[in-house]
Amino acid sequence: KADGVFESDFKAEYIERAAYVCPFCGFSEFESHGNEFSCKICGKTAVYGEDKRITGKGFKFPFEFFGEWYDFQMDFVNGTDVTEYTERPLFIDEATVKEVIIRKNKKTLRKNSELLLYGDRIAVDEGKENEWIIPFSELSAVSVLGKNKLNIYYGTEVFQFSGSKRFNALKYVNIYYRWKNIKEGNINGKFLGL
C-alpha cells in the first residue's frame, strides 16, 4: 500500500532475502542493486519506487506492491507438490554451518559449504567426501532468525546456516513446511513456517 514515501537509493536492496518465486518463471533467484532487482532466470528487471510500487522495466509487473507478490509466492508454494523435487535441487546456496549449543555458544562446523534445497531434504556439500544429507523426515522444525540465518532442529541438536547478506533462509522454511503439510495429509494446509 502506498501509505508514504520511501526515500532511499537502495529501496530494492536485499529483496532476494524474501523473494524466491518469479511471477513469470516460478522458483527462481533474484539479484538486487539499489532500487532495481532482476530475476536470474528470465532476466526481467523491476524497480521498487518511492511510493513502494513495483514497476517492470519494459513490461507490466503483475503486482503493484510487494505484499501482493509475497501472497502470490505463498500461494505458489502451497500449490506445488514439493515431494516431486527430489532429483535436482530447487536452490543452491553457500553457507557457514554451526552447531548451536543452547545457553552457551555456537561451534563452527563448516565454512563456505554448498547448501542444496530439495523438496524432501537439505544436502550439505553433496557429492563430496564430507557430504551431509538432512532428510526433512528427521527434522522437528525449521526457522528463520534475524535477517538471514536458518536454524534446523535435528533430533536433540540445533544447527544454524548463515550465508551472505543476500542469503534467503525463508525458502528453506517454506519448502520444509510445505513438505510437512503434504506428508501429514494436509495438502491444503497454508502454514509455511515463521
Model-derived regions, located:
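Acidic, Ser/Thr- and proline-rich intrinsically disordered linker/docking segments
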Residues: 132, 136-194
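Residues that act as N-cap/strand-start positions at coil-to-secondary-structure junctions
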Residues: 107-111, 128, 136, 146
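Structural motif
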Residues: 33, 118-119, 145-146
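Short, surface-exposed charged micro-motifs
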Residues: 45, 112-114, 141
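Cys/His-rich short segments
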Residues: 4-60
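Anionic N-terminal interaction surfaces
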Residues: 54-115
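Short hydrophobic/aromatic-rich beta-strand segments that constitute the beta-sheet cores
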Residues: 122-126, 152
